[in-house]
């Protein structure tokens, strides 16, 4: 029969062998899931773009709303997969915004808007929506939708979700359409 000490040592050994625990999405007081690796932003998009570019990453904005079942799936299914989390963390800075929120965000052109007004400016109507922005310093001079290099609207299964992030990370949008990229991947 194992002593308590032996049992505790064996349990600790199994826990260590399993590897480090993966961070899980946390439900915020506002009713949103949040990943601990999302960017803590002052909500000044031009500055966030500069810092992500300096870190060798691309900028993505995820729009969510309280009670959105597919937003929940993005966090509890897609972001919960270690391969997806690792890929996104290596290649992107991600900012989370509320489709109906009132926090003030400074857009690339210096215009200050509430989250709800910013969403309307970009034509974001549903959640989850993920916008991907080009790492260029002239975005302020472009129309809002022309600033994006890709957009995910709605929930995508993990494989397709990861492929959309790869399309941007690999800058495949500079060489052709998403459709051509996905065809080459199949």
Regions found by a protein language model. Give the residues of each.
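Non-catalytic, surface beta->alpha helical segment in thiol-disulfide oxidoreductase systems
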Residues: 126, 134-173
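N-terminal secretory signal peptides and thylakoid transit peptides that target proteins
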Residues: 1-14
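Short active-site neighborhood of thiol/selenol oxidoreductases, capturing the structured segment around
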Residues: 55-69
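Structural micro-motif
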Residues: 115-131
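A short beta-strand-turn-helix
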Residues: 41-58
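Thiol-based oxidoreductase modules, predominantly thioredoxin-like and allied folds used
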Residues: 85-113
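Typically the conserved alpha-helix immediately C-terminal to a functionally engaged Cys/Sec
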Residues: 72-87
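N-proximal helix/coil linker or "cap" segments that precede and/or mark the start of modular domains
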Residues: 24-38
